[in-house]
Structures are given as structure tokens and as C-alpha cells.
Amino acid sequence: MFDEIRPTRVEVNLDSIVHNFREIKRVVGDRVKVMGVVKANAYGHGAYHVAKALVENGVDYLAVATVEEALELRSYGITAPVLILGYTPLSQAGEAVEKDVTFTAFDLKYVKELGEIASRKGKKAKIHVKIDTGMGRIGYTDFDLAEREIEEMSKLEGIELEGIFSHFATSDEKDKDYAREQFERFADMLKRLEKRGVNITLKHIANSGAITDLNYAYLDMVRPGITLYGSYPSNDVNKILDLRPAMNFKTKIVYIKEVPENTSISYGRTFITKRPSKIATLPIGYADGLNRLLSNNHEVLVRGKYVPIVGRVCMDQTMIDVTEVEGVEVGDEVVIFGEQEGKRITADDIAKKLRTIPHEVYCGISRRVPRIYIYRGEVFDVKNYLKI
């Protein structure tokens, strides 16, 4: 299927993402809104397609990392509220104001200038104020300053103070003491603002780890990221969601050769055959997202059998040992992660080998890998980023 695109491709099952979203809604309840995090091209899954599916199924808000990501969604006709989680330079704010994008704010001078930009356009800039309760990134750490400046922000022309938020550093770890401290700091900030008569509609701090483990932190809205895509943030959280991985990473065998014992494979001769072997070449490498650290350190699926990567992963090609695979042929499907004949390899499995997190595995799949989208049980689109 889809012979007109590269043998190396990703299949994204949007039905799985919708299922995961509904699982999150089931856990947090109808009172709590959901902000679907689609930054970094929806963790490599495709921001537009994921956002569209989430909006069609009732997500309340979307979140991205940069102004460019927000404007990309607007260019595709996504009209749902979109929060830029990171800093937006004022030099880039004008179009975002026009397109009703929501800004993260943590400085009064910045917000005043943003309000002036919005007023000149006859608009109000919507902001969510960021409080750093212990992550160590952007956001107010001086709470006395924060409450004074936020009160002033709430009175500015050209500004709509819609939200306030923070981010957990350790919600996915076994020890929840630090996460609890962070929440208490955030709750203290909210009380201070209430005393000043500052009413803020959306208060949010719960990421994926907090959704599973810290139900007291749900507040008005939760911000699932990795759980939308079918992975837990760590092995230490409660597995209360029926998650379905949404991505399959696949390629095909393009060449098979039989080699004798003592044949070296790939750069550096890190693998030398110990027997007469069948070695298959795959048109996939670290430039596609198959990490070089998986050299001699990962198995893929061919005809329902686990077979090893042999030798170093190259930039564009990789070799596997298919000696034990009966009837193997050029053109056979190879699963890097995903399912085949009832067997599964997950992004989480790969992340463990790389001593990282599944987020990085998903995000590492490059733009030269086409995405095939499945929605409502059917293939409905193919995205080839390199097609002109």
C-alpha cells in the first residue's frame, strides 16, 4: 500500500489518540477541561491532523511551544483556543494577536507592550500567567511581585487575563513530596490573587503524571501530552488509563545478501558474522529517527519474528540479520516499533534502551519520513513533508 511514498513511513492512528483523550476525560470528569498538548508537531505525530481530531472530539484547548506552531494551526483552519506555552517575542506578537492566539506571560512590562500592540489592532491579547513553583524555567518565582503585577495586568486595556498555570517537575516519580510542595505553592499564589479580587477563569498545573497520580491538582483544566499519544510519562505512575499507542514506525527490506562467516557489517566493523548469514538492508537510518545508539542494540519485527540490528546504524541505511526468518523477501515489511502478527515493540521499549523517554523517540522521527493517517477506521490522508 502507498508504493508512491518512501518504504520508510509512520502510520498514525488518530482513532487511538481520540480513545486516549476520552480515557483522560473519563478519569478527570466532565467538570475539568482538557488542553491537548500538540507542540513539536504533536510529538512527531502531526500537529494539524492530531489537533483537528481532538477538536472534533471535544478538546477544550490546544497547547504549542512557539508562535510559529500556533500560527501553523491557524493556517490550517484550526480555530480552537491555542496557548503558546513558551515565550513569544513581541516582534512576533502582532499576527498572533490577530489570529486570537493565547500568550504565556510572566512580566508586567511585556504584558503592557503586548496590550498596546493588541489595542492598536482593536483587539485584546489573551494571556495565561506562568508561575514557576519549582520547575526552574520561565515564570514568576517572587510571589509578592507576582501578585502585584498580575493584579495590574488584570486591569490593562488590550489584555484579557484568562489563565494562570504552573508545571510539575516530578509528578511522574514515585516520591510525590516535591510535587505536593509545588502544588501548595501554586495554591498559595491563587489565594493571594483571590484576596486581591483578581478572578482568573482557567487555573491549570496538571500534566500527564498529575492526571494519573494527583487528582487534587486537576483544578479547572489538565494538560495531557504524552498520554494522548499512548505512552505513560514513566513507569512509576498509576496505570489507570487504557492507553493505545498511536504510532507505528515501519520500513521495508530493499536488499538481501548471503554472506559467509567472518563478514563485517557497517562502519567500524562492530559486527562480524559468526556463521553464514542472511543480511537485509533497510532504507532507514539515524537521519530518519532510528537512533544510532540502537546499533547492535535493538530488534525489529520481520514476518512476526524479532530480528537484530547488526552493525552500526548509518545515516540513511541499516542492516538486520534475517537468517532465521523463513521465506524472507525483498519488500517485506519491517516494524521498528508498532505491531506485526500479534507481536509488539513500543517506543517505550526503545526509550529504555536509549536511557531516555518515549517523548524523545516520537519527536526524533524526522520530516523526511511520510506520515499515513488513519481516522475512523480508514486511511484518509498521507503527509509527505518533502513533496513539493
UniProtKB/Swiss-Prot annotation:
Its cofactor is pyridoxal 5'-phosphate. The keyword Isomerase applies. GO terms for cellular component: cytosol. Its EC number is 5.1.1.1. It catalyses: L-alanine = D-alanine. The active site is at K39 (proton acceptor), Y267 (proton acceptor). Substrate binds at R137, M315. GO terms for biological process: D-alanine biosynthetic process; peptidoglycan biosynthetic process. InterPro entries: Ala_racemase (IPR000821), Ala_racemase/Decarboxylase_C (IPR009006), Ala_racemase_C (IPR011079), Ala_racemase_N (IPR001608), Ala_racemase_pyridoxalP-BS (IPR020622), PLP-binding_barrel (IPR029066). Gene3D superfamilies: Alanine racemase, Lyase, Ornithine Decarboxylase, Chain A, domain 1. PROSITE patterns: ALANINE_RACEMASE (PS00395). GO terms for molecular function: alanine racemase activity; pyridoxal phosphate binding. The keyword Isomerase applies. Keywords: Isomerase, Pyridoxal phosphate. Catalyzes the interconversion of L-alanine and D-alanine. May also act on other amino acids. HAMAP family: Ala_racemase (MF_01201). This is Alanine racemase 2. It comes from Caldanaerobacter subterraneus subsp. tengcongensis (strain DSM 15242 / JCM 11007 / NBRC 100824 / MB4). The gene is alr2.
